[in-house]
């Protein structure tokens, strides 16, 4: 039992170092083994962040990307925002920010009301596009 606990701790330390995952309790991981998807009935949204870290300030979703970039892609920010929304709903928890890890750097993305609103609008637009077979609504 002691050896297994030590190996698990050693593995966690390596994962944290490799991906720059902040200190805190890792409550969810999908990167090193498949995990059950998170589902928000309220927003009809499903997703699997790579990690969720529970810290004093709240739950922090972490998304790991294989590419290296100077600034985060807008699509990756929206993906992270979706994970923030899922964590907020599923865990009924405060989500102050999320983290996107690219190669040797990471970006802390604040989960603001503006980002949440932009995400919900984008989800609504995507659903409308699916309902109308890709046709956009005409603006008055």
Regions found by a protein language model. Give the residues of each.
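Short hydrophobic/aromatic-rich motifs at helix boundaries and adjacent loops
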Residues: 6-8, 21-23, 54-57, 95
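A generic structural signal for short coil/turn motifs at secondary-structure boundaries
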Residues: 69-73, 108-110
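Conserved catalytic cores of phosphodiester-cleaving nucleases, focusing on short active-site segments
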Residues: 45-70, 79-85
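A short, polar/proline- and glycine-enriched secondary-structure boundary/capping micro-motif
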Residues: 71-75, 119-120
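Metal-dependent nuclease catalytic regions and adjoining charged, substrate-binding loops involved
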Residues: 32-46, 89-140
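Metal-dependent nuclease catalytic cores in nucleic-acid-processing enzymes
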Residues: 75-97
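N-terminal signal-anchor transmembrane alpha helix of single-pass membrane proteins
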Residues: 1-18
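Active-site metal-binding core of divalent-cation-utilizing nuclease and nuclease-like domains
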Residues: 24-56, 75
